[in-house]
Amino acid sequence: MDLLSQIVARAKSDKQRIVLPEAEEERTLCAADRALADDIADIILIGNPAKVEALAKEKGLQNIGKATLIDPENYDKSEELAEKLAEIRKSKGMTIEQARELVKNPLYLGCMIIKTEGADGQISGALSTTGDTLRPALQIIKCQPGITCVSGGLLLISKQKQYGEDGVLVVADVAVTPMPDANQLSQIAVCTAQMAKAVAGFKEPRVAMLSFSTKGSAKHEVCDKVIEATRLAKEMAPDLKIDGELQADAALVPSVGAKKAPGSDIAGKANVLVFPNLEVGNIGYKMVQRLGDAIAIGPVLQGIARPVNDLSRGCSVDDIYYMIAITACQAMDAKK
């Protein structure tokens, strides 16, 4: 069974409630129909009922009736949620009038439904910007305990089966935090290992903190940051298998790892790679994807207390369908 099939199977094993606040968008509705047909999640759609039903009819979607459909303009819990939102944002000066308007916004409404235990995760981005997706999540759901930094993890599936877990690697940050400091980088490492377990199904994440230096082979403040981040990650998660700083070849190739970092538990065996900054991460994964013909799945947002994921506006129905399954796996993990 390939990785995506494994993720779908895990989602089916313990169905989660996933909010799709862009229900009037064609690809989103088609993905919802497929998810409902395959029984991988309980779907909550937010949108104008007449528009959603007309689109479903136009596209011949047979399963949308199984979803919970919420009209943001006429939701019977809107006032209750507005009062709770005003309380959450009271320190920022939000009034009840402002809160009432915000809960008509499907992205805010979805996050409030999650906050009040009515759902387990949310996916948007087919129409919305990353900022619009993240803003309500950070204002309402907030970060996991002990985490202040949101990041974007990615599943990389390579044809080179000798690397990672049978060719599967989990890498970060590729999407969110441009120049993490040592503390933020340590959080990214811990969250990426967590995602590797929850989504990729790794029994034992082995985290390499990447740099252009291996174990002091070069001296620079950016290497020092990676070394400090490794130390902080070990403090935050004492059972986590992690090492750094390591060059990419030392992290992935056993013979190189043995020469450059003798005695390391991670060198040559890494299945999770943490980049020193977003620039390196984003460029690096896209080069592997294009030049190495690898499959890239994600980014998957990490560090939020309940999963909220962001799609590319160029996403396909398949992308959304698999993100529903990924978000469900994250939601299961968040409840542990």
Regions found by a protein language model. Name each.
Residues M1-A267, V272-K336:
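Anion-binding alpha/beta catalytic cores of soluble intermediary-metabolism enzymes, centered on
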